[in-house]
Design a protein with these regions (language model features):
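C-terminal alpha-helical interaction module
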Residues: 1-8, 45-48, 68, 83-85
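Structural micro-motif
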Residues: 49-58, 68
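Non-catalytic, surface beta->alpha helical segment in thiol-disulfide oxidoreductase systems
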Residues: 59-84
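Residues that form or flank phosphate/diphosphate-binding pockets in enzymes
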Residues: 16, 39, 65
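Non-catalytic interaction surface on structured domains
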Residues: 25-28, 46, 72
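Local sequence-structure signature of Cys/Sec-based thiol-disulfide redox active-site neighborhoods
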Residues: 1-28
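Thioredoxin-like thiol-disulfide oxidoreductase module
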Residues: 34-52, 78-83
């Protein structure tokens, strides 16, 4: 099973949507709270090539992007392949 990490903020609707998709699929993930100014936020930006919006999603260490990119992967069928790896 793939290792999933999601950098999030409490009030973020896109974060909730991304987490909901993984929960609907029965896939476990690690949530990393990354409020503005936190070390976790800086880590998310570093790992994602400078992106500062939330969520930032990683599957097996590979940067996937945010919620829009996750939903695009789901729609194309590629998410299932990434999760099966």
């Amino acid at each position: 099973m793939a290792k999933i990490e999601i950098y999030t903020q409490d009030w973020c609707g896109y974060c909730a949507r991304a987490k909901s998709l993984f929960e609907q699929k029965g896939v476990a993930y690690t949530e990393i709270e990354a409020p503005h100014g936190s070390p976790a936020r800086a880590e998310a930006a570093r790992r994602s090539g400078g992106r500062t919006t939330m969520p930032q999603i990683f599957i097996d260490g590979r940067h996937i992007g945010g919620c829009d990119e996750l939903l695009a992967l789901e729609g194309s069928g590629q998410l299932a392949m990434l999760l099966a790896a």
